[in-house]
Each structure stands twice: as C-alpha cells, then as structure tokens.
Design a protein with these regions (language model features):
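Non-catalytic propeptide/linker segments at domain boundaries
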Residues: 67, 76-110
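Short, conserved acidic/polar surface loops in the N-terminal third of protein domains
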Residues: 88-90, 123-127, 175-177
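Short acidic, S/G/P-rich loop/turn micro-motifs used as interaction or catalytic elements
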Residues: 120-121, 139, 169-173
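Iron-sulfur (Fe-S) cluster-binding segments and ferredoxin-like electron-carrier domains
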Residues: 134-147, 348-358
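Conserved AdoMet/S-adenosylmethionine-binding subsite of the radical SAM
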Residues: 148, 153-156, 166-309, 316
Length: 358
C-alpha cells in the first residue's frame, strides 16, 4: 500500500468506522478479551501499512460503514468488498490486579492512555460539548495515590511505555490541574517515563508552570472549534474559557514546555474547513502542534447522528496542515502522547508524504 492509499483508507475508516464479522468478533474475544472487559470494542486501535488507526466499530454510525473487519486463516483484514488489506492489533497490557486493568489501554506501541476522571464539570444540561460521549461513572477522579501505585505495578511488568492522560475536567480546570500536578509528582518518584496530559487551560497560568515542574513533558489543550461564536454553540460550557485565554495558555505552555511540545485538537466536520486551516497556521506559528480529528457521532454524544466529516475534506485539511508542520518545524515524532500516536487523525501521514515529495 503506497502513502496515498494509506491516507485515503485511514480517512475513510476514521470518518465511517467499520463493522465486524461474527467470525472476527469471536476471534477477537478469544485472543484479546481485554478489548471487551474494558469496553474497547467501541473502537479498535489497529495498525495497517505504516500507520496507526483508531476505528469506531460499535457506535451506531459505524453500522452503515462499507468497511468490514474479517478474518481468514487467522489473519485479520479490512475489506470494502473490492480491496482488502491486513491489520494487526496492539494487544493488551499485562494484568496487574490493580485499577489500571480497568482504565489503561494501549493506543499504539508503547503509548498507554489512562482516563482517571469520567466526571466533567461541563457534562450538564445545556453545557455539554456536542461531540463528547463521556459518561460519568464516578463522582471523583481515581485517587492519585491509588493510581500511581497501580502505574508503578504496571511498569514493573511492562517497561518502555509512555503515559498519555485525558478525561473529564473534574470541578473546574484549576482543580483538575492540581490533580495532575499531584499525580505526576507521585509517578516521578519511581519513573522517568514520558508523560503527556490533556487538560483545559486553568485560570491561573502558573499552574502550567507547576505542571512542568512536577514532571509533565507534553501539554495538550484542545480548542476544538476555531470560530468563537460557533464554539459557544458547540461547547456551551467549555466556551466560558475564552478564546484569548486559550492563546495566553498556549503561549505560556510553549514558553515552559518548548516549541512543538504543546498541541491542540481541532474537530473537522462541525465547522468550515477554511476556519480550521486558518487556525492551524495561527497555532503552528507560535509552536503549538495542531491536530485535526474528524467528528464521529459517537453513542452518548449530543451531536446529531447525521453529522459527518467528508473524508475528502479531512485529506485536504491535513495536506495543508502537513505543509505548515514542515514550514514551522513541528515534527510529530518529537512529541510524545497523542501527537506521536496519530491514530485519530491523518496529518502525520500527510507529513510523511510531504517529506517524501520534498
């Protein structure tokens, strides 16, 4: 598969999801039972050609997908009825007997993602982000002492991993920043592993400095929607954090973490592509790595099921973004976490193509 096909099929899978045959489901259950016990069958992290891809498989919108995960002679493959290509899985983390068995998962080789908080202060009537599918399972985040001890056990059994933390914003952005600072300090007592954290910009920007001092390596603050008026409609609660404050936080984070060690997600399919491309350059020129993820109408998200991202638009945006990444010296391989994984977007693949064509 050449790079153009890789980009095409990844854009298709990200925007349309895929179905799974009964045979494939059965074999997945026997080979990767953790996919089911952790609810990972809602999406699968797969690798094909030279890319990672997080594919929706159980959400309602994926039931109409032209793509099917199947298996033959023990080999998993994806087909649209005309072309087929093999895929592999990243497998499961070792069993620790701790809370990470329920919360941690491999998103790509060596990238462990953990959501300590399922409680978001914006998950309220008339405040929840329209694209968000978070479901509150606990009133508070996992206790930092309990989680850090669990991660220590995991690292004793599985070395050379980095950590990517995400999840709901508990109480408010400042309180959540304090939680991350406390947790990372505890992890740093036993591990030098790279740590990336997704968080909403705190009102006190000194907390970003304290996160770096605690041992965080990468800061991820997702703006999601470029146009401020549209952002207020799509993110009615989170948009109380002003657009200007996001950029104040971006500038502070780049100052503290360094060029290319800060990133932000923009969501394609819910806003004009021209707005996204313009915002990408505004971010890139100050050292923030833009990531463009397509909207996926996930179950439990308020977004209408018919809200989709055109895969051709996603490719156009990512091709433009790849040129910006080269122009502003932003290399995904130098930023740990979501950016390096690249499973939910295609700009890394387009960046590789841009370098090949240079």
């Amino acid at each position: 598969m050449d790079i153009n096909e890789q980009i095409f099929y990844k854009a298709e899978l990200l925007t349309k999801g895929m179905r799974a045959s009964d045979v494939a489901k059965s074999l997945l259950f026997s080979e990767f039972p953790d996919f089911f016990t952790k609810g990972i069958m809602h999406s699968l992290n797969v690798r094909f050609s030279e890319t990672n891809c997080n594919v929706s498989i159980a959400d309602d919108f994926a039931h109409e997908s032209p793509y099917l995960l199947d298996v033959k002679d023990g080999q998993f493959f994806i087909t649209d009825g005309q072309k087929s290509f093999p895929v592999s899985f990243f497998g499961a983390l070792p069993h620790t007997g701790t809370v990470v068995d329920d919360f941690a998962r491999l998103h790509s080789t060596g990238c462990v993602t953990i959501w300590p908080s399922s409680n978001c202060c914006y998950d309220k009537p008339n405040e929840k982000c329209k694209f968000c599918s978070i479901v509150k399972e606990s009133e508070t985040p996992l206790d930092a002492d309990v989680l850090s001890e669990a991660i220590k056990k995991l690292f004793e059994l599985s070395k050379d991993n980095m950590l990517n933390f995400s999840g709901g914003t508990y109480k408010n952005p400042d309180a959540m920043a304090d939680y991350w600072i406390d947790l990372v300090k505890k992890i740093r007592a036993f591990s030098p592993a790279k740590i990336a954290i997704e968080f909403a910009p705190p009102s006190d920007l000194q907390k970003i400095v304290k996160m770096k001092e605690a041992g965080v390596d990468v800061a991820i603050m997702n703006l999601e929607v470029a146009n401020d008026d549209l952002r207020k409609k799509i993110c009615p609660g989170k948009s109380k954090i002003s657009y200007d404050h996001y950029y104040n936080a971006f500038n502070k984070a780049v100052e503290v973490f360094g060029w290319g060690q800060v990133s932000s997600v923009l969501i394609a399919g819910i806003q004009p592509k021209e707005d996204i491309m313009s915002e990408c350059e505004k971010m890139a020129k100050i050292g923030v790595f833009p990531t463009v993820m397509p909207i996926r109408p996930l179950d439990n998200a308020p977004v209408d099921l018919n809200t989709r991202c055109d895969p051709d638009d996603l490719i156009e945006i990512a091709t433009h973004l790849a040129k910006l990444l080269v122009k502003y010296n932003l290399d995904f391989k130098k930023q740990e976490g979501c950016t390096k994984c690249g499973g939910c977007s295609i700009e890394n693949d387009c960046y590789r193509k841009e370098l090949q064509n240079a």
